[in-house]
Regions:
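Short, acidic, metal-binding catalytic loop of nucleotide-sugar glycosyltransferases
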Residues: 23-32
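Glycine-rich, basic loop-to-helix element that forms the pyrophosphate-binding segment
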Residues: 61-81, 91-93
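Short aromatic/hydrophobic "clamp" motif used to bind/position activated sugar donors
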Residues: 86
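Conserved donor NDP-sugar-binding/catalytic core segment of glycosyltransferases
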Residues: 93-131, 136-138
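Non-catalytic, C-terminal membrane-associated alpha-helical segments of glycosyltransferases
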Residues: 228-279
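Acidic helix N-cap motif at the loop->helix transition within catalytic regions
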Residues: 19, 44-52, 61
Length: 279
């Protein structure tokens, strides 16, 4: 019998994106999935629309915007009927109907795999990769998506161990997620997914990229199109938290210098591109 899955979609004032995501989830082929929408105190009529259009999906309503980590943790904890596996999925995605099976198959066949994550494409450029695995070097101050903005090719067609699973879509055994302590709620947004993977790896776990599982992410594939000062600030706060938490104390000063240097380069580069696009 197929292992049971609880799938969580976090929503905050993202009605249209969430409705599209749920529409794709209605078509999934895995036989034993329960879909939950965690609403972070939305004010855009999301809850009513979801209830009307997707009555089979359960809504967990939180009183305010708890952010990514706390919101997902709270929704997960409020579900009394735990499943064998837990999947967290961004609301700004659409999924392949078959995306669940490869993730569960890999988790069931190898107990050392603690997280499985799919190949993720840009929704506005269907053959181009947004996430083909993750690579981390906190000592040098960088965290990278492998394959980002590259056209899909055979090099991204094989299972492989990676440094982290993106929170955009990650599958775990429920007991593993609970025993590791869930998401660290000191991360409001950005960095919590990398932190979770690092904690699993520090305990000897593997993070597996599973390209047979496919989803599409609704972010722009254009360089600089996604840039905002607020996002840049939050990402770098998350990165500094990761450095402070996961590397040796004597490495922290040099790592912070490199992080600040590369972050300022990113800021200048992205701001320049953004200005040129407005001309």
């Amino acid at each position: 019998m197929a292992g049971s899955v609880n799938l969580f979609v976090l929503n905050w004032n993202g009605r249209d994106l969430t409705l599209d995501c749920l529409s794709s989830l209605e078509k999934i082929t895995y036989p034993n999935v329960k879909v939950y929408v965690i609403d972070n105190g939305s004010s855009d009529n999301s809850v009513t629309e979801i209830q009307n259009q997707f009555p089979d999906f359960e809504i967990i309503q939180l009183p305010e915007n708890y952010g990514f980590s706390r919101g997902n943790n709270a929704g997960f904890q409020l579900v009394k009927q735990k499943a064998d596996f837990t999947i967290f999925l961004n609301n700004d995605t659409v999924v392949d109907p078959y995306f669940v099976e490869p993730l569960i198959n890999e988790m069931e066949s190898n107990s050392t795999v603690k997280q499985a994550t799919p190949k993720i494409f840009y929704a506005d450029d269907l053959e181009y990769i947004w996430f083909g695995g993750g690579k981390i070097n906190l000592w040098a101050g960088w965290i990278r998506h492998l394959g980002i903005r590259q056209k899909d090719s055979t090099q991204f067609s094989f299972n492989r161990n990676v440094d982290y699973a993106t929170g955009c879509c990650v599958c775990m055994r429920t007991e593993d997620f609970e025993s590791i302590g869930m998401f660290d709620e000191s991360f409001f947004m950005y960095g919590e997914d990398v932190d979770l993977s690092l904690r699993f790896r520090e305990q000897g776990g593997q993070i597996l990229f599973v390209p047979e599982s496919k989803i599409w992410h609704k972010v722009s594939s254009s360089i600089g199109a996604q840039f905002s000062i607020r996002k840049w600030k939050r990402k770098n706060i998350g990165k500094i938290k990761l450095i402070a938490k996961h590397i040796k104390p004597y490495q922290i000063p040099f790592s912070l210098v490199l992080t600040i240097f590369f972050s300022l380069l990113e800021l200048i580069f992205s701001f320049t591109i953004s200005l040129n696009k407005r001309k």
